[in-house]
Amino acid sequence: DATQAGFQPGETVRAIDLLYGVMLPSGAECCIALADTISGSEADFVALMNEKAAKLGMSGTNFCDTTGLHDANHYSTAKDIAVLLKYALRNDTFRKIIESPYHSTPATNIHPDGITFYSTMFKNLSDTVVTDGQIMGGKTGYTGEAGHCLASFAEIDGTEYILVTGGASGTGIPHINDALTVYNRLGAATQALNEGEIK
């Protein structure tokens, strides 16, 4: 079953809140609502997704739906997702959303107090600081077939790095722990290089 952000059928919602609902709690209803609004159907929006993937050179990618649920013909590679994330980070709105630990919507016709979403990455990350840097943002994913996945980015010693991992198994947050390990080792190597310990 797909994760939901909490919006209900017939609810009037701003597009920006749907975007936060996609990125922070992985709300499938937000993905489908945006696709329907933009293209008239999820299938037509998926065609646009595949067109964009081809333009970006994502040759190891084929999308079948907007939610990321398993389908034998729905696939990508870590490299392709990194290409997509690098491209998306050029958009200021996307960057603001993916860097947000939470987002509160205004009141709607169904939720008079609005809804607050929490980033599935940030809520499981007790500290964003890594050696010589900081994790800036990320998007988690999970299916039984793909395991725990994370597309993230961090700034280390003034340089922005993108890391995409998949297939993490086990309970808890193995994908987030993987990212912490890589970013900390990268930061330590950068420090050692700057201090002349590595030549």
Feature-to-residue mapping (PLM):
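Short coil/turn segments at secondary-structure junctions
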Residues: 14, 33-36, 65-69
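Penicillin-recognizing serine hydrolase domain
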Residues: 41-199
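Conserved catalytic neighborhood of penicillin-recognizing serine enzymes
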Residues: 1-32, 113-135
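Structured beta->alpha junctions
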Residues: 11, 23-26, 38, 67, ...
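Alpha-helical scaffold elements that line and support the substrate/ligand-binding pocket
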Residues: 18, 22-39, 45, 49, ...
